[in-house]
């Protein structure tokens, strides 16, 4: 196990690159003077759930933004189904099968559940451009039932739903949009235990079906071990650990964070001492 970010990470290599639906190699990204990502490499297999861990500012959200087409990397390569992946934007990434659920969910509160499920993909009657509300309701109900989301009324405004239900609707929209890979940016943020369990159950059902692969940012180690097949921990823009959840533990994940905190504190103290010595204060 690594005892600092600067040491060699524990990385479990895939059996074959052909197993991967998504592969990232040596990704780097600078945000102004800050290096957000440094030489990030990871992979995602079909039907796999990958949990991303790391402190605030570690680089997790930056990685998600690059994968989703919201930002461009400065260096490195990405491959989707074995082909070079260079999204020109979020819409381009979505058209290639990668969709993202951010913390704000991008739902329109005033619209109904079924309208939100078909947002920007509305069904219309032809040749007259009238919304096919009946067809959208039927398809929305089918889509929700297929992944086990219990929303009694799909004509109600999403503003009236709970946080867990809203998150579930946002996830269902990506599945309904034929996404192969779903990126979840802190799906359990600000949720109670009951609503969080609802989302974890949804992820478990999607994993069992094996139709989509999922990358999600989490902060709770127990949730990661419960919901994910594999975990990648990012510390200061580098991979500090990448291994199957069955081969790690809460204790190991905690040790990595504690060791990094100690390393950072020692560096701060050393820098302060060097500065004081240069100023003749020691």
Show where each model-derived region lies.
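Glycine-rich phosphate-binding loops of nucleotide-dependent enzymes
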Residues: 2-5, 9-282
